[in-house]
Swiss-Prot record:
Any one GO biological process: one-carbon metabolic process
Amino acids binding ATP: H15, D179, G180, K181, R246, F247, D255, R261, K262, A278, K282
Protein's name in the database: S-adenosylmethionine synthase
HAMAP family per the UniProt record, alphabetical: S_AdoMet_synth1
Name of the gene: metK
Residue sites binding Mg(2+) per the record: D17
Keywords: ATP-binding, Cytoplasm, Magnesium, Metal-binding, Nucleotide-binding, One-carbon metabolism, Potassium, Transferase
Amino acid sequence: MKKMLFTSESVTEGHPDKICDQISDTILDAILEKEPEENKMNARCAVETLVTRGLVVVTGEVRTSAYIDVPTLVRNTILDIGYNRAKFGFDGETCAVITSIEEQSPDIALGVDRSFEVKSKEKEDPFEKIGAGDQGIMFGYATNETDAYMPLPILLAHRLAKRLADVRKSNTLDFLRPDGKTQVTVEYDENNNPVGVETVLISAQHSPDISRQELEEAIKEHVITPVIPENLVTKDTKILVNPTGRFVIGGPQADTGLTGRKIIVDTYGGWAPHGGGAFSGKDPTKVDRSATYMARYVAKNLVASGAADEVLIQLSYAIGVAQPVSINIDTKGTAKVDEEKIYKVVKEIFDFRPAAIISNLNLLQPIYQKTAAYGHFGRKDVEFPWERLDKVKELKAALGL
């Protein structure tokens, strides 16, 4: 039997890059929360964060009528993650916070506020008004491999990372500190079905007074065993806990973090392609974010409808243009109906213009900080509108399923 291994990784909320993602999305949420309802569609946010030893730098472009206390938001986010003592190497109370935030470029605003379609045809359709915030390609994916419609390796890696944070915050394992990483290797058979977990790797920041043996035993009992399904653990499954032997110095004390450096962790763990655009700190007129959510929404509903076992969707946009430049649907040979029919039905049922995506998925809510750690897709601990399965019935009827 041919053996195929696939590996995905995740990181905890205390990882330096994820600290930055959470800060950027916390600022976006504050804008969406404080902006008057009638003006939310005009609010803009593109915020980048850097964290390093004792320092946070927040920069970017924003358009809002609301007052946003950025330093306080930064400090509270860091404290909530768990960096609240100097001995952890980083402290939200005492770190320096530098901000350099400007207004959105008027050249960009020209095309986003009033799309190419409106300028050229004077269309009255409100969904034509907003153009894409940039050019680019975006991918969405779903598979019936798991009940979350996600590939198993990234799903398990996220759940291990979340579990690491949960047992730390509940003081179940009070020697843990905020930084951490997980990685899961899954074995697949010749039909691409998962048959076992080949390797579990966990690197967890810890206090200096815990022995390696105690740490390993505690991680196995309280993190790995509750997450990895028993039927996927074999006699050959390898468990690696802190293979360097020590992980006391972590977080921004050990590594500089930046917004948008964990884009594969954020999506499908490398199983599906990525267009390259990060999510955090971007308002939903940025199609890097909203169109990726839309592509996932469509792919998930298609798989749930029984149209295919897996679906990969690619979208592309031009800056300032409302309509997508291209839509590609790939079922990897698993379609139960004609792919041309699937494409036609998708274009009839779903609207891929940015304003329509924002409206239909209700993307002007302050929900983004929750996306900034443990993945944007396939979550059970939170509900996101792009994870809804509210088009399954309509798709089944249209596709004759």
